């Protein structure tokens, strides 16, 4: 079976005041369609950096210094940002580790949920609203219509994490990366 995602010999380096720091060195794995892969390791071992590399969301002081990241055989490293924007959310989505900082505090939950739906699902505001409310229900948020009009600071940490999960699955991506998705959940 062909891999949906293939990461081969990935190397990521950060430029620091003290010089070059290699955060990921030689990571390789593949994920087939319909499969689940868990990457475990101690804090600081490069799990999140690997995930951010796949999405090409590394900071300006970081660079992929070697290796390959392929989605359905297509190399992602070096793709123009415009093309990566089409891939993010639509083909690959991520549940980020920290819902406290991942949501924009100046935008309502509804605005933040509707944006990727309108962008990737080619629908208008009314349909995006309906889909966003539905996905909030699916992740266990009570009174989703009310929550759509609220700002992140008005929600508990667990509810914010559920919003992050809803945002990640809202466009039904082919690959979902979950970086400690249950960290803040009230379960």
Task: Report residues per predicted region.
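ABC transporter nucleotide-binding domains
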Residues: 1-186
């Amino acid at each position: 079976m062909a891999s949906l995602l293939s990461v081969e010999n990935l190397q990521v380096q950060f430029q620091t005041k003290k010089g070059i720091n290699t955060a990921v060195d030689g990571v390789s794995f593949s994920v087939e369609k319909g499969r689940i892969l868990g990457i475990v390791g101690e804090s600081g071992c490069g799990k999140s950096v690997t995930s951010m590399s796949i999405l090409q969301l590394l900071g300006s002081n970081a660079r992929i210094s070697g290796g390959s990241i392929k989605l359905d055989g297509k190399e992602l490293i070096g793709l123009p940002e415009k093309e990566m924007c089409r891939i993010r959310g639509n083909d690959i989505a991520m549940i980020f580790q920290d819902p406290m900082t991942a949501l924009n505090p100046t935008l309502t939950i509804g605005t933040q949920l509707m944006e990727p739906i309108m962008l990737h699902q080619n629908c208008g505001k009314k349909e995006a609203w309906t889909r966003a409310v539905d996905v909030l229900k699916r992740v266990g948020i009570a009174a989703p219509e009310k929550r759509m009009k609220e700002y992140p600071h008005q929600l508990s940490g667990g509810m914010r994490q559920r919003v992050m999960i809803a945002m990640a699955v809202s466009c039904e991506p082919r690959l979902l990366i979950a970086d400690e998705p249950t960290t803040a959940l009230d379960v």
